[in-house]
């Protein structure tokens, strides 16, 4: 009997019961309204496909979220197949990235592979050694995540970094726009407000003390035209003649000298030639 018992196979588990048929997906909209209908080929002919009740709205929202998740998974799988997601190895020099947790711990990375530099603090070194010896894969995973977060492309910084001097130049431009337009030096010439500049240095520092203000007097176009007309060559020839003026002066002097000589007295006024000879 013992031999027969030893020869019989012993069942490993309990006797299998009646096998269930695989679960068929059912239409959730029909289930909300108390009907059971298989989902295969039923979406087009569902009686409640356009229902707007609260339960059907919730189901529609869930379906949209699930469709978005499926599309995202497909896109990630395609990018992994094409190798877009994997970071490319940089052929340039080493990049030194400062660790945010420890200020004096630097990581030198070259592409994907990188080893943390030896920290100066012996306690932190012992702690890092024990952590790496206990779970090297976890430490490598954390380090890779930190590296990917800290390393960004230079084009990202060049494109998204705001300008340093935008606010300064914007304030200057607004200041020149707010200046009144009648501040120009010439009243006839109106200068645009964005081209008007003001001096940052006081004018009294380089002007003589007799002058009260560095601003020149205002001129108008009428004064300018009048001055130009008075200094024109036509007006000089029409109003003045230097030779006529000299002849009239010399004739007056000669007449006065002759009158004094005829009266018998000495002249009180000497000619210009005698005065120049005496001084010599």
Swiss-Prot record:
Residues 27-74 bind DNA. It is found in: Nucleus. One of its GO terms (biological process) is regulation of transcription by RNA polymerase II. The keyword Nucleus applies. The keyword Zinc-finger does not apply. GO terms for molecular function: DNA-binding transcription factor activity, RNA polymerase II-specific; metal ion binding; RNA polymerase II cis-regulatory region sequence-specific DNA binding. Pfam families: DM, Dmrt1. Testis-specific. Localizes to Sertoli cells. Its main location: nucleus. Keywords: Activator, DNA-binding, Metal-binding, Nucleus, Repressor, Transcription, Transcription regulation, Zinc. In contrast to dmrt1y/dmy paralog, which plays a key role in male sex determination, its role is unclear. Belongs to the DMRT family. This is Doublesex- and mab-3-related transcription factor 1. It comes from Oryzias latipes. The lineage of its organism: Eukaryota, Metazoa, Chordata, Craniata, Vertebrata. The gene is dmrt1.
């Amino acid at each position: 009997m013992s031999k027969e018992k030893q020869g019989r196979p012993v069942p490993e588990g309990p006797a299998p019961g009646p096998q269930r048929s695989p679960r068929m997906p059912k239409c959730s909209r029909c289930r909300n309204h108390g009907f059971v209908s298989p989902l295969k080929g039923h979406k087009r002919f569902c009686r409640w496909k356009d229902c707007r009740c609260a339960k059907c709205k919730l189901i529609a929202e869930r379906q949209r979220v699930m469709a978005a998740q499926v599309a995202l998974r497909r896109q990630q799988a395609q990018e992994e197949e094409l190798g877009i997601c994997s970071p490319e190895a940089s052929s340039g020099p080493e990049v030194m990235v400062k660790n945010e947790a420890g200020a004096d711990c630097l990581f030198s990375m070259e592409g994907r592979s990188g080893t943390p530099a030896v920290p100066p603090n012996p306690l932190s070194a012992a702690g890092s050694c024990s952590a790496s010896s206990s779970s090297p894969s976890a430490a490598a995973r954390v380090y890779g995540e930190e590296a990917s977060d800290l390393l960004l492309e230079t084009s990202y910084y060049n494109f998204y970094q705001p300008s340093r001097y935008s606010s300064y130049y914007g304030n200057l431009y607004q200041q020149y726009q707010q200046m009144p337009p009648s501040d120009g030096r010439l009243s006839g010439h109106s200068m645009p407000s964005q081209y008007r500049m003001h001096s940052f240095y006081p004018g009294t520092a380089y002007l003589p003390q007799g002058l009260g203000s560095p601003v020149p007097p205002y001129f108008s176009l009428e004064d300018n035209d009048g001055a130009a007309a008075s200094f024109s060559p036509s007006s000089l020839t029409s109003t003045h003649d230097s030779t006529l003026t000299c002849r009239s002066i010399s004739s007056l002097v000669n007449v006065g000298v002759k009158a004094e000589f005829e009266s018998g007295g000495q002249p009180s006024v000497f000619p210009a030639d005698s005065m120049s000879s005496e001084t010599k």
